[in-house]
């Protein structure tokens, strides 16, 4: 299943961002960016990077609303969260001409439904959600989501899913044959 997640970097969280000359403060998903990369960036640019992490879009939103606004220069919400945050006035607007390379965004990513015209976000990552099976432990049919939702006895206690409500609900919808964009 393809899922556009962590696809947007939301720039300058509201007007009172954490901007300070020579410093960059990032709010990013847990374990997405290695410390070595941040160290290399600092060595090459002289800009000190601080990164706080979160494990879900909802945790990020709650943290920002609980007093984290203005703490970060850049945050990395998933696609649907950009729309929520922009609707609540939590994101700054990217002015025309503000990002020199904005015109280099591939057309398929330039005008997403969650941020028309890319006024609050830019593409960052795209990924797929899937599942894998250790075929040494399980030799049955692996081409079905039934092994997740109606697991055979040999998989009992051996199934783990992402801690992401949206991802699991989308997978369950596919399993049950429901359309993805239906209410």
PLM feature segments, named:
Residues 72, 77-183:
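Extracytoplasmic ligand-binding site segments that recognize negatively charged/polar headgroups
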Residues 14-20:
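Sec/Tat signal peptide C-region and signal peptidase I cleavage site
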Residues 11-12, 64:
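Short secondary-structure capping/turn segments at boundaries of alpha-helices and beta-strands
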Residues 1-10:
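Sec-dependent signal peptide recognition
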Residues 18, 31, 166:
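Short, glycine/serine-rich, charged loops/turns that create anion-binding
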Residues 21-84:
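Early extracytoplasmic/lumenal segment of secretory-pathway proteins
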């Amino acid at each position: 299943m393809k899922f556009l997640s962590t696809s947007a970097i939301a720039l300058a969280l509201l007007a009172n961002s954490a901007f300070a000359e020579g410093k960059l403060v990032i709010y990013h998903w847990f374990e997405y960016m290695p410390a070595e990369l941040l160290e290399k960036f600092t060595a090459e640019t002289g800009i000190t990077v601080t990164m706080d992490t979160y494990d879900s879009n909802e945790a990020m939103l709650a943290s920002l609303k609980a007093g984290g606004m203005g703490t970060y220069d850049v945050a990395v919400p998933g696609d649907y969260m950009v729309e929520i945050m922009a609707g609540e006035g939590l994101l700054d607007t990217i002015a025309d001409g503000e990002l020199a390379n904005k015109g280099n965004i591939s057309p398929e990513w330039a005008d997403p439904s969650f941020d028309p015209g890319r006024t609050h976000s830019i593409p960052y990552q795209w990924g797929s959600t899937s599942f894998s099976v250790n075929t040494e432990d399980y030799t049955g049919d692996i081409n079905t989501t039934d092994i997740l939702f109606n697991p055979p006895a040999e998989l009992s206690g051996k199934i783990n899913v992402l801690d992401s409500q949206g991802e699991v609900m989308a997978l369950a919808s596919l399993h049950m044959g429901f359309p993805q964009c239906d209410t």
